Amino acid sequence: MINIHEIFQPQENIIHFVIAHKMNFKILLRFLLSVSIEISAQSYSISGHIRDLKSGKLLDGTVVLLKNNLYTISNTLGYYSLKDFPKGSYSVRISRLGYKSLSTTVLIDKESVKQDFVLESSPIELDEVLVNSSRTSKYLRNSPYSELLIDKTQIESQSSLSLSDVLKEQPGLSLSRDGIWGTEINIRGLSRENLVTLIDGNRIATSTDVAARLSMIDLDDVERIEVIKGASSSIYGSGATGGIINVITKTPRFNENFILQGGFSSGLNSVNKLFSSSGSIAGGNSFWSSKISGSFRKAGNTQTPSGELKNSQFKDFSLSAAVNFIPLENNLLKFNYQLFKAEDVGIPGASVFPSDAEVRYPDEKREMISAGYEIQNISKVFYKVSAKYSYQVIDRNVENLPHITQNVAATDTTEAIRAAVLKITPSSIHKNNNLQFQTDIILGKNNNLILGLDYWERNYHGIREKFQKIETLASDGSVFNTTIKVVGEKPLPDSKYKSLGFFAQDDAALFDEILFFTLGVRVEKIFVSGESTLNPLYEIANGKINYTPKGQKVIWNKIKADEISDSWNLGLKYSCTENLDLTLSIGYSFRSPSLEERFQYIDQGSYVRLGDPTLKAEKGKSADLGFRYYTSDFKLISSIFYNRFKDLVAEIPGTFEGKHAFVKTNIGKAQLYGFDLHSEFNFLNNYTFHITASYVKGDDITAKGNLPGIPPLNGNAGIKFTLVDYLVADISSTIFAQQNNTATGEMKTPGYSYFNLSCASTYNKFGLIEFQAAGGIENIFNKDYRNHLSTSRGFIKSEPGRNIFLKLNLKW
């Protein structure tokens, strides 16, 4: 569990950073409360319910937008409420995924107006939903960026094991494996350190060598996932050169009267005998709201068409809680807690280990607490002021059984020796502090400016122990002496990475909302420090410890470095007609090398991976040109993109102390370019054809070769249709071309295709309970294939085989 005393240790956290600048949270709270006093008396309100036009079902998650910044989201009872604004005539826009948006005018001429709305379902997703991935709310259709939204309804009907499984079918996104549980996402040829991953706006900062950050999230607690492809959002700073993944968890919503609700979900997968279950309880009234939820999953080894994938089992569970209060009108106070823990997680494929090694996470944990305060409707100019703090601990422990035995022949002066490496146990703790301030300012009609300051830091502490059994052999081969030795090493020095950034972004709609304009800038100061590090750190021989073992030396000197970087982005969306939009986004981005890239020293028996403290920051320039076409029965979203990088960080082959090594190096110039598209066509009644396609080419300009980790041309196509009322089926095929444009050391990958079938009902009411059932078959014909990105990382040569899945979701 999080130790509250750790949060307030001197020099270790953001609290002391704030105190050092003569501020504390009491002063902050007083400031926020004083600002709230300036809010003019605006006692008018509107409330009501949102329903489905055909069934009359109450619709949750519906956005009701009263004006540019004043909006709310309906709760699970379909209830919405907007308060404290002047009387007058307002344009109201109501939108929800899976429905046609509704725009109307409402006259607010009395203190409390009751107004219900009905929405008509749509077979085509028209992107009339709000997204917040650029730190400000805007309709997805109006975003100039290549942006994606995946909501909870899509997650509820899938068999996904991790966040990467949810995202892999989206255009421009591909899955990369270090295992079945441990996965990563590749966005247009960039992944891991080039992507910023957020949960509720808080960075998940940890090592990406053996993937885990996207696996430590309870999917049943996810409200939606927002993805920006490419370096279009500079306001997140270092690391966003490839894109942003922002996971928003479910938030308890307020209600005019007290409510108590619950939910339960359970699922089965045949391919690995997965059993999953989760539950939640939420309640509240007009003053407070809260929720608590938890999940449990257990899976055995995964079956592939070529046999069982050994050491691919896992078990995990999660717990989360949230409490929200409205202490004053237009004020909101939020608290959140999240715990995710995994045990006995097999890692069958990571490339840092020998091919016959047995590697697992004995335990893996992510724990986070956060608090936020915001004030809305402050004045006609200052719309909102918000502050948020989070503290996150990621605890990673690896156990590697390398099965390495070395025999040393006897000489004239020494006996024969048989040395076996019994196990290697790297472990690390990553502590993250994050503090954010943001002000939303209305400069004019359809012109909003945000100003903000954020600080985040990652503190790393780790150790690696190597357990050896050394046997001295007699001339006849018998053992006459045995030594059990434990060697302690530091894979990285104890180190810190700190970032302090100021950001600003202006969003404007011009010429009667024909042109949408976005300009964002960020200036960032980065501090990196590492302690002097000895290797070996110590040796223990038959229980006796030695802190000055033979061969001990300094592998990293104490280091402190800092740099100032800037980034910016410009986005335009032009509506040529009511149905046709053109978009353009350009940007300049940077990425300061991570702690692992600067200081890494991993020797797991197969080869050595080394960092370089003198690495330069990556700098990138990007451009994205988009074409979008919408009608009631057809949708086409497409983009072509180009990214050019300077001082790109990559691993190149080398040697270290006579061993084969991969060394982190600035390789010079590189470029990535390609396209992706997504289309839906409702060609007959409830039959909708959907297709995606993605292509990216990566060039190492300096070395005149190919970049590693580039997915081949790929896409999927399928038909979604209604079998009977409230039951929807989808049959699709995923297709990958061969990948022959490989980097040095990469395997070429043949092309393949496989087919999927899924069915999902809508929620149907039975008494007080609403239920939904989903099921399907993945990889119907048990196709044996290799994922190029998994092959380039490790030793998983065959992806999961045929999987029959079932899911049941209940709520009341």
Tell where the protein language model's regions lie, with residue ranges.
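Transmembrane beta-barrel wall of Gram-negative outer-membrane proteins
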Residues: 45, 270-298, 308-344, 363-377, ...
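Short, acidic, small-residue-rich periplasmic hinge/interaction motif at the N-terminus
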Residues: 51, 62-64, 95-99, 109, ...
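Short acidic/polar hinge/loop motifs at secondary-structure boundaries
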Residues: 83, 175, 202-229, 660
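N-terminal periplasmic accessory domains that precede
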Residues: 114-118, 163-166, 181-186, 198, ...
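Flexible loop and strand-edge segments within Gram-negative outer membrane beta-barrel domains
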Residues: 305-306, 310-312, 330-384, 391-415, ...
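Outer-membrane beta-barrel signature, preferentially recognizing the C-terminal barrel domain
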Residues: 352-378, 490-497, 554-567, 571, ...
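Gram-negative outer-membrane beta-barrel transporters
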Residues: 510-515, 526, 641-645, 659-741
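C-terminal beta-signal and adjacent terminal beta-strands/loops
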Residues: 644-647, 671, 726, 761-812
